[in-house]
């Protein structure tokens, strides 16, 4: 007799679009669809595309005769874990303090779990990806801002002494001033926004490389008369472009990777004393440049001045990539 297939509905709320999927107990995506993220709407209007997508997943599961055992949601913000509500979701403020789990459990009669997106990504990697078999994990994602999560034996560590506002962890005393008022925060040194500013400085210095020329050509192709050269480059800069040029040997791109690698190494060194992670999982579009960033981070953790514990941290790339938070949002449901 064939065992009934168990699946869970995963909802990964993103800035441009939200992914909703059916995930099986092995972490495989069995069916998925996308729902538009509607900003600036009342809460029920914001949730409507997600609810419709969940309905579609449940209809598909019924058609396939799959047993649905729960719903997992990852959100890009902070949570009130006691009330199981989003606490602060800056891009979707109508969700703030809304009883999202209660609504979903009432509507679908399924147990529902809510996670911060970076925590969900860590759970995905722990159960099904690059974190399998590791007791003490540090997960670091480099996107527009920097996010981090820590786990011991698969349990996310939520102590404010550890992750907290990770993007505001100071890693350089003389670094750029951050919006929080401090200097040298991680967000000012290794986020995608920080990398964009590095490119802008290269443009102002007049450095002519393939990367800077591509950005200048993109800016000039849309007009921009009367604007300083390169002033519109933020519109075209991306992790994929940076990685592509770094792989081709572009000096500016490779210098950015070197600086980011040193910054990540400094951040990990700060965590070692608090947490002693055994493995660091890196995620984000900048990993598209093969092992370039991984090599830089490993090098920064193995300098003569590095502690023995730092040099023992294993540095690996994410295995689940963009699906990490999606898969991780339902991983505890199967545990």
What does each model-identified segment do?
Residues 1-69, 80-85, 102-110, 127-134, ...:
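ATP-binding/phosphotransfer module of carbohydrate and carboxylate kinases, centering on a glycine-rich
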Residues 18-22, 146-151:
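Short beta-strand scaffold segments in enzyme catalytic cores
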Residues 33-35, 90, 160:
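Short hydrophobic alpha-helix segments
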Residues 36-39, 94, 163-166:
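A short acidic/small-residue loop/turn micro-motif
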Residues 84-96:
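A charged helix-plus-loop insertion that forms the helical arch/lid used to bind
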Residues 112-116, 150:
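General beta-strand structural signal in soluble alpha/beta enzymes
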Residues 117, 143, 329:
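Active-site glycine-centered loops adjacent to acidic/histidine catalytic or metal-binding residues
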